[in-house]
Regions:
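Contiguous, well-folded functional domains in the mature portion of proteins
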Residues: 1-179
Length: 179
């Protein structure tokens, strides 16, 4: 669990996981995630077995919902893993009233999801809230119009990489070179 230098702001969303960005699409929010139904921005991060598997809060706020769902153990890098695999949902409400969803998804090898946060807890941005063992995935659900600051294929660092800007002031990145 390496130390991280987390940007502290009221509107930036940092990566909750270390790994490769799989998706930054707009799609229907899962029905079992306690957010209003409709189109939301999903940013998916895949952690391979060599990545740090500690999960960190992408924003500061109060945990308002959690839910565990049993499921399959498909390869976490495929799209249907988001709804078919074992997963742990968490919804965080920011001071602004904006809610975001964070979903820990077990992978082919990972069969142990640990959520350390509970409903009513306050999380600081970058604070450890859980861990997933071995290859797995974390999906972050944001309002559909949220501009993203990462590209598919880019490597994200948990607690440090800025995924998005909820203030709407940052321009969305649509192309570029990723490491």
């Amino acid at each position: 669990n390496p130390k991280r230098t987390t940007p502290i702001t009221d509107y930036l969303v940092v990566s909750p996981a270390e790994g490769r960005i799989l998706a930054t699409d707009v799609s229907p929010v899962p029905k079992d995630l306690d957010l209003p139904l409709g189109e939301w921005r999903r940013i998916s991060i895949f952690m391979n077995v060599f990545d740090v598997h500690v999960n960190r809060s992408p924003v500061a706020g109060k945990v308002v919902a959690t839910a565990y769902h049993k499921g399959a153990f498909l390869n976490a890098s495929i799209d249907k893993a988001s709804e078919q695999n074992e997963r742990q949902n968490m919804v965080v409400e920011m001071a602004s009233g904006q809610k975001i969803g964070v979903v820990q998804i077990a992978g082919l090898v990972a069969r142990r999801i640990l959520l350390e946060a509970a409903v009513g807890d306050h999380l600081n941005v970058g604070q450890q809230y859980g861990i997933i063992r071995f290859g797995s995935r974390v999906d972050v659900w944001l309002p559909a119009t949220t501009p993203v600051n990462v590209l598919v294929g880019q490597t994200a660092i948990a607690g440090e990489s800025i995924l998005a800007d909820l203030s709407g002031k940052m321009e969305e990145i649509t192309d570029g070179v990723c490491r």
